[in-house]
From Swiss-Prot:
Keyword Protein biosynthesis on entry: no
Protein name: Phospholipase A2 homolog P-elapitoxin-Aa1a beta chain
Keyword Secreted assigned: yes
Annotated source species: Acanthophis antarcticus
Top-level taxonomy: Eukaryota, Metazoa, Chordata, Craniata, Vertebrata
Quaternary structure (record): Heterotrimer of alpha, beta and gamma chains, each related to PLA2.
GO cellular component terms, semicolon-separated: extracellular region
Gene3D superfamilies in alphabetical order: Phospholipase A2 domain
GO biological process: arachidonate secretion; lipid catabolic process; phospholipid metabolic process
Localization in the cell: Secreted
GO MF, any single term: toxin activity
């Protein structure tokens, strides 16, 4: 949903990978 999508983009912005990679693999921040 949009909430999870927004969290993935936020995570991607804090990481080293582009946001598209996070949309493909999911966000693993904090794990």
């Amino acid at each position: 949903d949009l909430f999870q999508f927004g969290k993935m983009i936020e995570c991607a912005n804090k990481g080293s990978r582009p946001s598209l990679d996070y949309m493909n693999y999911g966000c693993y921040c904090g794990k």
